[in-house]
Amino acid sequence: MIGLIGRKVGMTRVFTEDGVSIPVTVVEVEANRVSQVKTLETDGYAAIQVTAGSKKANRVNKAEAGHFAKAGVEAGRGLWEFRLENGEEFAVGAELTVELFNETKKVDVTGTSKGKGFQGAVKRWNFRTQDMTHGNSLSHRAPGSIGQCQTPGRVFKGKKMAGHMGAERVTTQNLEIVRVDAERNLLLIKGAVPGSTGGNVIVKPAVKA
């Protein structure tokens, strides 16, 4: 399923003809350039590799420079891949724009969530706090028991505990496209999308629409 790579600009609002305010996230979609086409014969699966934006020449290593030169496209800030469905064909060097979503109503948006650093179980996992009084003087935000005793004699993997919060890949599904601005290469998506301002986001047609 083909999507687009964009950059989160920030949030604003637009008004309907009835005067209703709709909160939207603005995603800037610079031209997505196809840097490689993968086929069943050569790679075992069908996909396109795309790059977006630009990168300083002194930040492009020789391997990347050769790869982009072979495709005849400008070096971008990263490489992403989209699987192709039967019948879909793209040429190396082709450009994908926001017009790809002219007929699309709902999208899934993937980004890297804001990093929150080391956080306790209350903030990280929404644990309830313990009593503020009634004899409790030290363990107000402590997580409590983390397991059993000699059986099994260990803490199970995946146990919700304090640790690094955020800075992970997150997908928000079924967001509505409010407007496609082809002139300024902008997508206006209803509601919030993952990540901080300036972060990369992947916008794809919704799988559950």
Swiss-Prot record:
Modification N5-methylglutamine occurs at: Q150
GO molecular-function term, one example from the UniProt record:
rRNA binding
The keyword RNA-binding is annotated on this UniProt entry? yes
What GO terms describe the biological role, i.e. biological process, of this protein?
translation
In which family does this protein belong, per the annotation? Belongs to the universal ribosomal protein uL3 family.
Q: Which NCBIfam families match?
A: L3_bact (TIGR03625)
Q: What does the subunit comment say?
A: Part of the 50S ribosomal subunit. Forms a cluster with proteins L14 and L19.
Q: Outline what the protein does.
A: One of the primary rRNA binding proteins, it binds directly near the 3'-end of the 23S rRNA, where it nucleates assembly of the 50S subunit.
Protein name as catalogued:
Large ribosomal subunit protein uL3
Q: Which organism is it from?
A: Vibrio campbellii (strain ATCC BAA-1116)
- The gene from which this protein is expressed is rplC
